[in-house]
Amino acid sequence: MVNAEDLFINLAKSLLGDDVIDVLRILLDKGTEMTDEEIANQLNIKVNDVRKKLNLLEEQGFVSYRKTRDKDSGWFIYYWKPNIDQINEILLNRKRLILDKLKTRLEYEKNNTFFICPQDNSRYSFEEAFENEFKCLKCGSQLTYYDTDKIKSFLEQKIRQIEEEIDKETKLGANKNH
C-alpha cells in the first residue's frame, strides 16, 4: 500500500513535474518549518530557484508559509511547511478544475456544428468549414457532417461521474471535521 508521503510526492510530480520534488521532499523529511535559505543550503541551489519551486508548490496547495519580520534587517522571513494533511483538498480542487474544463467542452460541443474529413478525420467547426468551402485544408476532400452525440454523451457521463465523486468526497470531508 502506498503511504501518504509517497502519494503526496506522486501527486505533486504529476501536477508540477519532477523539478519541485527535491524541495518538497526536504520539507517532508525535516518535518518542521524551514526557510527558503535553509532549503537552498541543504540542496546546494540558489535561493531564487527554491523560491520559484516553493511558489509553484504553494499555488497548488502543497505547501504553505507563515512570515515574520526580521527585527534587525526589516526583511520578511518565510517559514515553509508541507500541507500533507491537505491532500484530499488538493485532489478535490483538481477534480473541480477538470469538471469546469469538461463543462466548457460540453458547451462548445452543444453550441457548434462540426464537419469531418473522411480521409484524415480532421474536424472543423461550421465556420471553418464554410470559410474553406467545406473542403479539407490538408487533402482537399469534401467534408461531411459530424454528429457529436457520442462525444456529448461521453462528456455528460464524465461530468456526472466527477460531480458524484466531488459530492461524495465533500461529504466525507465534512463528516471528518465533526
From Swiss-Prot:
Show the domain comment.
Answer: The winged helix domain is involved in binding to DNA in the preinitiation complex.
Subunit structure and binding partners: Monomer. Interaction with RNA polymerase subunits RpoF and RpoE is necessary for Tfe stimulatory transcription activity. Able to interact with Tbp and RNA polymerase in the absence of DNA promoter. Interacts both with the preinitiation and elongation complexes.
What is the similarity comment for this entry? Belongs to the TFE family.
Q: Where is the HTH TFE/IIEalpha-type domain?
A: 4-88
Q: Which GO terms describe its biological process?
A: regulation of DNA-templated transcription; transcription initiation at RNA polymerase II promoter
Origin: domain of life = Archaea
- Indicate whether Transferase appears among the record's keywords: no
PROSITE patterns noted in UniProt: HTH_TFE_IIE (PS51344)
Alphabetized InterPro entries for the sequence: TF_E_archaea (IPR016481), TFE (IPR039997), TFIIE/TFIIEa_HTH (IPR017919), TFIIE_asu (IPR002853), TFIIEa/SarR/Rpc3_HTH_dom (IPR024550), WH-like_DNA-bd_sf (IPR036388), WH_DNA-bd_sf (IPR036390)
Which terms does the record give in the GO molecular function aspect?
Answer: DNA binding
- Species of origin reads Saccharolobus solfataricus (strain ATCC 35092 / DSM 1617 / JCM 11322 / P2) (Sulfolobus solfataricus)
Per the entry, what this protein does is: Transcription factor that plays a role in the activation of archaeal genes transcribed by RNA polymerase. Facilitates transcription initiation by enhancing TATA-box recognition by TATA-box-binding protein (Tbp), and transcription factor B (Tfb) and RNA polymerase recruitment. Not absolutely required for transcription in vitro, but particularly important in cases where Tbp or Tfb function is not optimal. It dynamically alters the nucleic acid-binding properties of RNA polymerases by stabilizing the initiation complex and destabilizing elongation complexes.
Q: Where is the signal peptide?
A: none
* Keywords noted in UniProt: DNA-binding, Transcription, Transcription regulation
Q: What is this protein called?
A: Transcription factor E
